[in-house]
Amino acid sequence: MKQNPKISLIGSGNIGGTLAHLISLRELGDIVLFDVTEGVPQGKALDLMQAGTIAGSDINIKGTNDYKDIEGSDAIIITAGLPRKPGMSREDLISINTGIMKTVAANVKKYAPDAFVIVITNPLDVMVYVMLKESGLPHNKVIGMAGVLDSSRFNLFLAEEFKVSVSNVNSMVLGGHGDAMVPLARYSTISGVPIPDLIKMGLSSNENIEKIIDRTRNGGGEIVALLKTGSAYYAPAASAIEMLESYLKDKRQILTCAAHLQGEYGVHDLYVGVPIMIGKEGVLRVIELQLTTEEKALFDKSVEGVKKLIETIK
C-alpha cells in the first residue's frame, strides 16, 4: 500500500486548523498538527478526523505538543506566531515572532531537514528569511505564502469589476507582502486579454483599476477591520494549499510566492514576492518579468521596505 506524504502544520490556530481540513478533504497526505498549547492540536485533530468520516477521508491526523512527531515530514507549513495586537509596534511583533521562528527552524533542521517548507507567519518576508537562515535548508525548499493570496484578492475585485467568472481572471502581484506590494495590471488578464486592453475597449477605467489596486494592497487590513478580533484565514490557507499541491504532485505551477532571490530582479539575499515554478524539487525556477520603469520603481520601493524590516533582526 502506497504511503501517504507526511505533512506537518506548525501552529494550530485558525489557519492551521483550516489547512488541516483542506488537506484532509483533498487527501493530500497524513497530517501532524503541532502547537505549544496543550490540548488544542489534539482537540482539533479529533474533531477533524470525525469530520473526515463524513467526507469519506481516510487521512490520519495527529495532534501533538512534541516536535519529534514532525520527524521525516515531506512538507511543513508554518503559521506559528503571535498576531499583531492593538498598541503593539511592528518591531515588537518582529522581535517576538523571530524568537518563535528560530525555535521552529531548529526543530525543522533536527527532525525534517528534507522537507519543503511554506511559511505563513507575519511579517512574512522577514519570517521566511529567518526560517532559511536558521534551518540551513536549501533556499529552493523554503518559500513564503504571499502573492497567491494577494492575487486571489486582486482576482476577486477584477472579476467583480468586469462582471465575469473568477476562473476567467489571472492576475499578478509582486513585491513584499505588505502595503507596498505591486499589483501589475499589465500582466493581469481576463480570459487572456490584458487589463489595459479592456480599459481601451471601455469596459473599465484607469481610475477604477487604481482603486482596485489600492483595495488589493489593503486586502488583509480590510478583513482585520471587519473582524475586529482577528485576521483572514480561509484565503491564506487555500493559498498555501495551492503551493503545497504543486510540490507534492509535481504540477510545476507558476505561482507568485516569497522566494529567495540571488540576483534575479537585481535583488540579492532577500525574500520577495515573484512568480516561481513549483515542482517536486521545490522552487524549480524564478520567472523574471520585464518591468517598465514605473513598475520597477514600485518594485524596488517594495524591496527597500523588506530590507528595512530585515535590518531590525540583524
UniProtKB/Swiss-Prot annotation:
InterPro entries: L-lactate/malate_DH, Lactate/malate_DH_C, Lactate/malate_DH_N, Lactate_DH/Glyco_Ohase_4_C, Malate_DH_type3, NAD(P)-bd_dom_sf. GO terms for biological process: lactate metabolic process; tricarboxylic acid cycle. It is an enzyme of class 1 (oxidoreductase). NAD(+) binds at residues 11-16, 35, 97, 120-122. The keyword Iron does not apply. CDD domains: LDH-like_MDH. Pfam families: Ldh_1_C, Ldh_1_N. It catalyses: (S)-malate + NAD(+) = oxaloacetate + NADH + H(+). Keywords: NAD, Oxidoreductase, Tricarboxylic acid cycle. The active site is at residue 177. Its EC number is 1.1.1.37. It comes from the Bacteria. GO terms for molecular function: L-lactate dehydrogenase activity; L-malate dehydrogenase (NAD+) activity. Substrate binds at residues 84, 90, 122, 153. NCBIfam families: MalateDH_bact (TIGR01763), PRK06223.1 (NF004863). Catalyzes the reversible oxidation of malate to oxaloacetate. Belongs to the LDH/MDH superfamily. MDH type 3 family. This is Malate dehydrogenase. It comes from Rickettsia africae (strain ESF-5).
